[in-house]
Amino acid sequence: SIEFLHGMKLVWETIMKHLVDHYKGLAILRSVSVSHFDGNPWDKGGTCKKTQPYFDPDGKMELPWTPNEIFKIQNNELRKAIVLKGNASKPILKLLDVTYSSLLRPDGHPGVYRIQSSTEPKNDCVHWCMPGPIDMWNQLMFSDPDVMCMNMSKDSNS
């Protein structure tokens, strides 16, 4: 809904302003990941029983409307923050873009693998726990030289 997106924009504006004004390190912000409910939303009996990744060699699979709009907000607010910080070397602001790659991994949700009590939700198609998606996010993050340099300097100070 429009109210949700407006709230998301305000949150990202506030976070970016705070980082630019008060933070002097490396900030890695993760883009929105995609849920994979089939049939209905989570609270109306939607399920996510996928056990294999999607195959999209041409990159033509479209993002659902809501994650696409959230991603635009995240990207725009990060760009505005980079302009706002100007020539300052700190903070270093990075966006770990997992939005499209998470779309391709409906098999990474715990829903079909969970053992749950009768009081717990029956499907979890939003959170990530299975090997694959999270490992790929880590590889993306640590392939960035700024992240590697920050980690190396932390290790050398201990």
Could you say what each language-model-derived stretch is?
Residues 1-158:
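Extracellular glycan-modifying ectodomains
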